[in-house]
Amino acid sequence: MPQALPATIVATHLERIRRSVPLTHVITNDVVTGFTANVLLALGAAPAMITAPEEAGSFAAIASVLSVNVGTLTSAQAATIRIAVQSANQAGTPWVLDPVAAGVLPYRTELCRELLQQHPAAIRGNASEIMALAGQAAAGKGVDSANQSDQAIEAAQVLAKSSGAIVAVTGEIDYITDGERVVSIKAGDPLMTRVTGTGCALSSVVAAFIAGCEEKDRLDAVASACAVMAIAGQRAAAKAKGPGSFVPAFLDNLYLLDAVTIAEALA
């Protein structure tokens, strides 16, 4: 049975991020780079979008955390990802995988399955992506899921156990698991799906939240990342007229989040 996450835990992890300002190495897709950087800055992290293969390994070794997203994958980016992940592992830098459209396109699916063997600290995806990586039948529409998040809870648990990662399957309700315990986050707003990048940015926020976090606390950290994004989205949508006004309102609400607003949203 999924558990709710106490608001105090979310607030504690958010305060830790703002205090520590984790250097977050982001290798993401071309569509969302700027938005992702702004989301991280609004929350208090320090994004660095280092993508050159000549630099990615060196930077992953000194970063607080690495976030990998395969959304607009090319062979050159795949090489960069492999270099960065190997360097991160050698340096003890935790890293997060966002397996965009895994299970839909063979090339990226093969790369994601290869990366599963490289010990990601967390995996964040939609239901279809998580089900595909867990070896279950899934229905995806390009980068979008044709499965509901609750349909992927079992797959997320299987994937968490096989990979050793915390797995977050996101949708109308987010489910986060370490293979045994399952936490659910019910917040957010449908307007979040009408702008590009909220899911991809979430994966980098997950990375920032696990930076400097003890392994035993990673489940709560990942769930807290999902919670702050959902809460900010919900609050922004309440005042936005549409996608155009939603984005700046969303960034503002990430910046303004505090223990009181978190408690109100999760009450």
Curated annotation (Swiss-Prot):
Source species of the chain: Tolumonas auensis (strain DSM 9187 / NBRC 110442 / TA 4)
Protein name per Swiss-Prot or TrEMBL: Hydroxyethylthiazole kinase
Positions that bind substrate: 49, 197
Catalytic activity: 5-(2-hydroxyethyl)-4-methylthiazole + ATP = 4-methyl-5-(2-phosphooxyethyl)-thiazole + ADP + H(+)
Gene name as annotated: thiM
Binding site for ATP: 124, 170
Functional note: Catalyzes the phosphorylation of the hydroxyl group of 4-methyl-5-beta-hydroxyethylthiazole (THZ).
Keywords: ATP-binding, Kinase, Magnesium, Metal-binding, Nucleotide-binding, Thiamine biosynthesis, Transferase
E.C. numbers: 2.7.1.50
GO biological process, one term: thiamine diphosphate biosynthetic process
Cofactor(s) needed: Mg(2+)
Keyword Metal-binding: yes
Pathway assigned in UniProt: Cofactor biosynthesis; thiamine diphosphate biosynthesis; 4-methyl-5-(2-phosphoethyl)-thiazole from 5-(2-hydroxyethyl)-4-methylthiazole: step 1/1
Gene Ontology molecular function: ATP binding; hydroxyethylthiazole kinase activity; magnesium ion binding
Family named by the database record: Belongs to the Thz kinase family.
SUPFAM superfamilies associated with the record: Ribokinase-like
Xref: NCBIfam families: PRK09355.1 (NF006830), thiM (TIGR00694)
Superkingdom of this protein's organism: Bacteria
